[in-house]
Amino acid sequence: MVERIVNSEDVSLLVSGRQSNPHKFLGIVSENSSQDRIILFRPGAHSVVVELQGNIAHAQHHHSGIFSLTAPKGTLPQDYRIYHQNGLLAHDPYAFPPLWGEVDSFLFHQGTHYKIYECMGAIPYNVQGISGVLFVVWAPHAQRVSVVGDFNFWNGLVNPLRKVSDLGVWELFIPGLEEGTLYKWEIVSASGEVLIKTDPYGKRFDVPPHAPSRVVDSDRYTWHDAAWMEKRKHRGDQPLAIYEVHVGSWQWHEGKPLGYRELAKKLAAYCKEMHYTHVELLPVTEHPLNESWGYQVTGYYAPTCRYGTPEDFQFFVDHLHRENIGVILDWVPGHFPTDGFALAHFDGEALYESIENHEPLHPHWRTYTFDYRCNEVVNFLLGSALFWLDKMHIDGLRVDAVTSMLYLDYGRQEGEWSPNIYGGRENLQAIEFIKHLNSVVHREFPGVLTFAEESTDFPKVTQAVAQGGLGFDYKWNLGWMHDTFRYIQVDPLFRSYHHKDLTFSLWYAFNERYLLPLSHDEVVHGKGSLLQKMPGDTWTKFAHMRLLLSYHICQPGKKLLFMGGEFAQGKEWTPDSPLDWHLLDHPDHAYLHKCVARMNALYCDLPYFWKGDGKQGSFRWVDFKDTENHVIAYYRFSGEDRSSALLCVHHFSSGYFPSYVLYCQDIHSCQLLFNSDDCCFGGSGKGNRQPVLCLDQHVSWGIDIELPPLATLIFHVDFVN
């Protein structure tokens, strides 16, 4: 009988919710040489009906929810199905061998299971011709792990997982479940506490907070972007005009944010109109708070459900690709929130979070930092990045808060952190993680870009890993951004004393490959909108806006502008309301909008702005010493070509000079291409006179230009051979 097969201690552990290997005695068990026995566990059930080889049979009830029935010798999982309490007729979850293997354990423990997103979480699966869902989770400190959902009435005793690895990996294949099934993990900690957790590897969640995960087939979507993906592999130096977007507040319809599909069409058309090459999305990874920016991530493998399904998000990316617009994701591997339903103390103890510092919470955000010493945690983060690149076709990752990852003492006081093994402040494990991330991303997905938000002078951020660098493609030039805003907010009368703020960044502009950000961070927390930062009356404010944004385009480095800046959003950005698109009905805003579109078009069309822009040879000063008139001028070159250039002139005072001479030699011809003070952009109309060469015995020594107030002029220059 069943008592001879099943150990009473195993049953006791099962009934009390502490069993780590239910497959040891549940499922198909050999009873003797002539027959098998099917052993089932149905807590609270009075009867269990089984379809065995086409015949209906009632299992015998023993005790404590244990049922059994005899079966022919050699019975297979395909030979019988169980009528479950929810009405589902499906095969026995406890009749199948483990699917997680030794190779999986080895790679996961090494932190190199780069397809971990196909093995962890809830994966639609087919085993021996039987369809269902494979549930896998890492919880090394747990006594017991169960999957709960509507299919078992959220009863954690019904479907306990089996521990399949000494690493603490748990697994259960449940036949008959399908895509869309709701589920959570029920975890019994080492201390006996029962925890209900969402899936760290969940690909879809319901409305937060405390939302259950949903089973998703990430491969179901049919992509139409093959041409884009192939072209991306072979990218060389290219223009990057990035439009930074918060999905929930870009545009609304009938009082709600646009969904992914509607947003795809409107945003793609808008980016083409404005000549943006890429969009960068503030984090769309799942997060608990509706009114947040998305940086408190609880679902690292799931696009937020607020705007649609994962398939809707795939459509969004696909559509932008078909319109030749890239998609960059703001990704947050530096810290995670303390919400108890997600990663925090996942199995009852610190698992994903670091306990290296004396104070576990990050002082700036009151969040946990990841434990980069643990390879399984590193693999979780690498898997997240690679999932978005593989399954969602993302073109780039902007890695948030890199500085906080690089330094152990970031934001901490003395006594709140411990030095590394060399006595230094560098977080050696985080640095290795970053190098690993960039190496594997660039190897597995050629053409994908990575960006570092890094605010210190940490060396070699954009040098290759093989050359001792961190391996990023670009670093945000936050120094340039701070200097620029500090200068432009000064009244023009006093700018002579701040001239170095315009010139200082050019001393280090080629130490790294830089992106120049005018990002969301500068229009929040009381800093005001870009327009509000500008000094002067209304006309002067808009002249400053045209000057700022054209200066941004002309400077060496790739470009990023946060939404609303292109038409001078009047108020500070907030994530819980849409941009003020009605402002485009006002001439000043419409003129600026037109000016930005023209500047972006020039930027994309003229390689002088972007070809080799990370190299010293792409830039040469013409004049940086005119502090009295607040003028700077410089050449931008296209790669190694020195036969021609763009001459960029920026005038930061409100004065007007009908004749202003720049001392520049060997010019053969010079033609005005762009004037931010043109009437068509809302300017005064000054500065449109074509330049006049200054000659001495037929040799040019300078040019005479008309210099309008608060304006940028761009000239195309051919040099004497």
Curated annotation (Swiss-Prot):
<dbReference type="GO" id="GO:0004553">
    <property type="term" value="F:hydrolase activity, hydrolyzing O-glycosyl compounds"/>
</dbReference>
<comment type="similarity">
    <text>Belongs to the glycosyl hydrolase 13 family. GlgB subfamily.</text>
</comment>
<dbReference type="GO" id="GO:0005829">
    <property type="term" value="C:cytosol"/>
</dbReference>
<dbReference type="InterPro" id="IPR044143">
    <property type="entry name" value="GlgB_N_E_set_prok"/>
</dbReference>
<dbReference type="Pfam" id="PF22019">
    <property type="entry name" value="GlgB_N"/>
</dbReference>
<dbReference type="GO" id="GO:0003844">
    <property type="term" value="F:1,4-alpha-glucan branching enzyme activity"/>
</dbReference>
<dbReference type="Pfam" id="PF02806">
    <property type="entry name" value="Alpha-amylase_C"/>
</dbReference>
<feature type="active site" description="Proton donor">
    <location>
        <position position="453"/>
    </location>
</feature>
<dbReference type="InterPro" id="IPR013780">
    <property type="entry name" value="Glyco_hydro_b"/>
</dbReference>
<dbReference type="InterPro" id="IPR054169">
    <property type="entry name" value="GlgB_N"/>
</dbReference>
<dbReference type="InterPro" id="IPR006048">
    <property type="entry name" value="A-amylase/branching_C"/>
</dbReference>
<dbReference type="Pfam" id="PF02922">
    <property type="entry name" value="CBM_48"/>
</dbReference>
<dbReference type="InterPro" id="IPR006047">
    <property type="entry name" value="Glyco_hydro_13_cat_dom"/>
</dbReference>
<dbReference type="InterPro" id="IPR037439">
    <property type="entry name" value="Branching_enzy"/>
</dbReference>
<keyword id="KW-0320">Glycogen biosynthesis</keyword>
<keyword id="KW-0328">Glycosyltransferase</keyword>
<dbReference type="InterPro" id="IPR004193">
    <property type="entry name" value="Glyco_hydro_13_N"/>
</dbReference>
<dbReference type="GO" id="GO:0005978">
    <property type="term" value="P:glycogen biosynthetic process"/>
</dbReference>
<comment type="pathway">
    <text>Glycan biosynthesis; glycogen biosynthesis.</text>
</comment>
<keyword id="KW-0119">Carbohydrate metabolism</keyword>
<dbReference type="Pfam" id="PF00128">
    <property type="entry name" value="Alpha-amylase"/>
</dbReference>
<dbReference type="InterPro" id="IPR014756">
    <property type="entry name" value="Ig_E-set"/>
</dbReference>
<comment type="subunit">
    <text>Monomer.</text>
</comment>
<keyword id="KW-0321">Glycogen metabolism</keyword>
<dbReference type="InterPro" id="IPR017853">
    <property type="entry name" value="Glycoside_hydrolase_SF"/>
</dbReference>
<dbReference type="InterPro" id="IPR013783">
    <property type="entry name" value="Ig-like_fold"/>
</dbReference>
<dbReference type="InterPro" id="IPR006407">
    <property type="entry name" value="GlgB"/>
</dbReference>
<dbReference type="GO" id="GO:0043169">
    <property type="term" value="F:cation binding"/>
</dbReference>
<keyword id="KW-0808">Transferase</keyword>
<comment type="function">
    <text>Catalyzes the formation of the alpha-1,6-glucosidic linkages in glycogen by scission of a 1,4-alpha-linked oligosaccharide from growing alpha-1,4-glucan chains and the subsequent attachment of the oligosaccharide to the alpha-1,6 position.</text>
</comment>
<feature type="active site" description="Nucleophile">
    <location>
        <position position="400"/>
    </location>
</feature>
<protein>
    <recommendedName>
        <fullName>1,4-alpha-glucan branching enzyme GlgB</fullName>
        <ecNumber>2.4.1.18</ecNumber>
    </recommendedName>
</protein>
